[in-house]
UniProtKB/Swiss-Prot annotation:
Pathway: Amino-acid biosynthesis; L-histidine biosynthesis; L-histidine from 5-phospho-alpha-D-ribose 1-diphosphate: step 3/9. The gene is hisI. Pfam families: PRA-CH. Zn(2+) binds at C87, C103, C110. This is Phosphoribosyl-AMP cyclohydrolase.
């Protein structure tokens, strides 16, 4: 990622990104070297600008109603190596270098519940670290 404010002001980018009516766009974070899908989150324009300028993933927390700088409380950061738009401009793919785990449950990926053919759900990966170790004794609520 280029760390320039000029990039965040690129008119072509703002014309290409199709935000929802409430000003958000879904974002998928994927580990750049393995292709592992780590998580899904949301960005508003401010979060996207900050991500472009800093090269670090910044999202919009719908539950908290504020910017969520990935790793600000856990230390589990995402360095953004590339940002891609899908064909419709309504979803962003971040290729990241994930430090530690991506999920607030302590798992590498948020996608650890596998749904079987009859609808049963099986947990396919165990936590690598406890939420308490990441966020302290008070734990962590969903971003």
């Amino acid at each position: 990622m280029k760390n320039t404010s000029a990039l965040a002001e690129t008119a072509a980018l703002w014309a290409a990104v199709r935000f929802t009516a409430d000003g958000l766009v879904p974002v998928i974070a994927q580990q750049h070297d393995s292709g592992e899908v780590l998580m899904m989150a949301w960005m508003n324009r401010e979060a996207l600008e900050e991500t472009l300028v800093t090269g670090k993933a910044c999202y919009w927390s719908r539950s908290r109603g504020r910017l969520w700088r990935k790793g600000e409380s856990s230390g589990q950061t995402q360095k953004v190596l590339a940002l891609r738009l899908d064909c419709d401009g309504d979803t962003i793919l971040l290729l990241v270098d994930q430090t530690g785990v991506a999920c607030h449950t302590g798992r590498r990926s948020c996608f650890f519940n596998e749904v079987g053919p009859t609808g049963e759900i099986t947990v396919v990966s165990a936590p690598l670290v406890t939420p308490e170790a990441l966020y302290g004794a008070e734990g962590h609520s969903h971003p």
